From Swiss-Prot:
Annotated source species: Pseudomonas fluorescens
Main subcellular localisation: membrane
This protein's UniProt keywords: Cell outer membrane, Membrane
Cellular localization per UniProt: Cell outer membrane
GO cellular component, one term: cell outer membrane
Protein name: Phosphate starvation-inducible protein 1
Length: 39
């Protein structure tokens, strides 16, 4: 799974674009919401 720290690292390294970063962050937030609901 992707986490926020990994996302920041990839963005800092220039391995993902700003738009990819935003997209992945949104996905991450959605995943976290679903996990909270599941608990």
């Amino acid at each position: 799974a992707v986490d926020a720290k990994l996302l920041d690292m990839l963005k800092a390294n220039g391995q993902i674009s700003a738009s990819q970063y935003t997209e992945l962050q949104a996905e991450l937030a959605k995943d976290q919401k679903e996990k909270q609901i599941a608990q």
